[in-house]
Amino acid sequence: MATYLVGDLQGCYDELQLLLETVQFNPVQDKLYLVGDLVARGDKSLECLRFVKSLGAAAQMVLGNHDLHLISTALGIKKVSLQDHVEAIFTAPDFVELIDWLRHQPLLVHDEKCDFVMSHAGISPDWDLDTAKSCAREVENELQHGDYHYLISNMYDNQPDRWSADLQGLQRLRYSINVFTRMRFCYRDHRLDFACKASVEKAPQELIPWFNLDNPLFKVQNLVFGHWASLVDTPTPANIYALDTGCVWGNRMTMLRWEDKQYFVQGALKDYF
């Protein structure tokens, strides 16, 4: 049995399949973890959704910002982004089933046996693990059981940009969604920045990668995330695993076998733009 973790798919279905062939993935005995953003700019988002769903218990994903945006467009709240290639999803006979399955996926996964925590974008520098798990469950409960139309309609905002235990209701949920699915850089006072998507080397000096801020959790816990393609080839602390290496941007898709920490890569098969 082996545990594999893979970076953002973004509709790059063929590259995923080649990686799974390379590692001889066996869904009967192996487990595949996905850091989110199954859909968006690649041309096989529908295939990615169907495949991951078909794996059942052999796969575990977390929701990314593009996955949430797909739910939003499915509800008619937002329009499909011009760069996204998700049209086939909306005309698929299993469209409703796929969207319902997607909104039942978590924002955070803690595999205690393998000793890693996975989310799409990261963990707030102001959270310990219990707080992170609690905040994730609060959002998941709304998406899965509550008035998720209201939540999805009101999640598009950059405020609040700083954590407080006193946050309640929509403010608290929105902060959590932004941390789990959108965060990259923070200021020294832990305020979230959403403007900069650059590499660490090219970012303004006042911005700090979230995982380099002072949080005891970041020093002891294995953290796995995607979302940040411009981090490719940028060193991170030994316990921080950044798996989005920009396949949809013409770079490569990266898969990590957890047991021996061996990486497998597959270059982009085409220019998606």
From Swiss-Prot:
Q: Which InterPro entries match?
A: ApaH, Calcineurin-like_PHP_ApaH, Metallo-depent_PP-like
Q: Does the keyword Hydrolase feature in the UniProt annotation? A: yes
Keywords, A to Z, come to: Hydrolase
Q: Which GO terms describe its molecular function?
A: bis(5'-nucleosyl)-tetraphosphatase (symmetrical) activity
Enzyme Commission no? 3.6.1.41
Q: Which domain of life is it from?
A: Bacteria
Q: Does the keyword Oxidoreductase apply?
A: no
Ranges in coiled-coil conformation: none
Annotated catalysed reactions: P(1),P(4)-bis(5'-adenosyl) tetraphosphate + H2O = 2 ADP + 2 H(+)
Task: Report TM segments.
Answer: none
**Alphabetized PANTHER family for the sequence:** CYTOCHROME C5, PTHR40942
What role does this protein play? Answer: Hydrolyzes diadenosine 5',5'''-P1,P4-tetraphosphate to yield ADP.
Q: Family per UniProt?
A: Belongs to the Ap4A hydrolase family.
Q: What is this protein called?
A: Bis(5'-nucleosyl)-tetraphosphatase, symmetrical
